[in-house]
């Protein structure tokens, strides 16, 4: 198997197959569940809005795909600094049956010089997750832009108990970049290598996925990236990975997240 095909296979195993669109419906989420069971194996998870968790759980169970985890989003997409609302949303997501919660860090507050609210929000949301539910924190690196802010946000999230740090919501012009990934995974290497990393949005094909996986191997070791420590947040990426593996047609036209 070529390096490109190896990257494609690994990226599928590490994927949070995502739909977070305003026009999402039960039917679209059912279709997403079926896409997550690929000819190359199951994706790690699907990522959907909280209201669709029950239909997704029912569908995955009917498919015999209980191992595909269900992730959802809270404080999304704007990363507001109201801790109480973020906690209520996170509790509701867990009550719906989420296995993982992707919460948006209050990145604008950090840009304005407030480090405390982000730390406290992540800490409170981690407590709201309880046992067994992973908390992934989206720092919106493409808006932070400044390497010092990306580093600070990553440090605050890890110190507050995040299970993963994630680049992006996919709702802003700049999403996952190799530059941001290097800063974020460097912080993981310094602070706690049990914390995971999730590049989201903008990873378009096997070559790009391979670049992120190669960076992870260089910074954290060849064996580090597993579904417990590395995810790709993506929607259109899957089509291109299956094409690389000669298991489907390439994506046509402009593609989303």
UniProtKB/Swiss-Prot annotation:
Which residues constitute the catalytic centre? 102, 166, 198
Task: State where the protein is found.
Answer: Cytoplasm
Q: Which UniProt keywords apply?
A: Cytoplasm, Lyase, Schiff base
Known EC number? 4.1.2.4
Q: Which reaction does it catalyse?
A: 2-deoxy-D-ribose 5-phosphate = D-glyceraldehyde 3-phosphate + acetaldehyde
**Part of which pathway?**
Carbohydrate degradation; 2-deoxy-D-ribose 1-phosphate degradation; D-glyceraldehyde 3-phosphate and acetaldehyde from 2-deoxy-alpha-D-ribose 1-phosphate: step 2/2
Keyword check for Nuclease: no
Got a GO cellular component term for this one?
Answer: cytoplasm
Which BP terms from GO are recorded? 2-deoxyribose 1-phosphate catabolic process; carbohydrate catabolic process; deoxyribonucleotide catabolic process
- HAMAP family (UniProt xref): DeoC_type2 (MF_00592)
Q: Which family does it belong to?
A: Belongs to the DeoC/FbaB aldolase family. DeoC type 2 subfamily.
Physiological role: Catalyzes a reversible aldol reaction between acetaldehyde and D-glyceraldehyde 3-phosphate to generate 2-deoxy-D-ribose 5-phosphate.
Matching NCBIfam families:
deoC (TIGR00126)
- What name does the UniProt record give this protein? Deoxyribose-phosphate aldolase
């Amino acid at each position: 198997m070529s390096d490109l095909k190896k990257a494609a296979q690994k990226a599928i195993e590490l994927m949070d197959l995502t739909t977070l669109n305003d026009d999402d419906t039960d039917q679209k989420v059912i279709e997403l569940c079926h896409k997550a069971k690929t000819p190359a194996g199951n994706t790690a998870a699907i990522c959907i809005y909280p209201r669709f968790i029950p239909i997704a759980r029912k569908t995955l169970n009917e498919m015999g795909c209980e191992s595909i985890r269900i992730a959802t989003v809270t404080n999304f997409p704007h990363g507001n600094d109201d801790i109480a609302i973020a906690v209520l949303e996170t509790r509701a997501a867990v009550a719906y049956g989420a296995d993982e919660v992707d919460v948006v860090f209050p990145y604008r507050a950090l840009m304005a010089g407030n480090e405390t609210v982000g730390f406290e929000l992540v800490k409170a949301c981690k407590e709201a997750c309880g046992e067994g539910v992973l908390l992934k924190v989206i720092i919106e690196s493409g808006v932070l832009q400044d390497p010092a802010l990306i580093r600070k946000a990553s440090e605050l999230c890890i110190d507050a108990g995040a299970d993963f740090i994630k680049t992006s919501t996919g709702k802003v012009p700049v999403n996952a970049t190799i530059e941001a990934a290097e800063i974020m995974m460097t912080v993981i290497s310094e602070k706690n290598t049990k914390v995971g990393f999730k590049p989201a949005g903008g990873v378009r094909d096997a070559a790009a996925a391979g670049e992120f996986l190669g960076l992870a191997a260089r910074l954290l070791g060849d064996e580090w990236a597993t579904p417990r420590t590395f995810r790709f947040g993506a929607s259109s990426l899957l089509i291109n990975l299956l094409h690389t593996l000669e298991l489907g047609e390439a994506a046509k036209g402009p593609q989303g997240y």
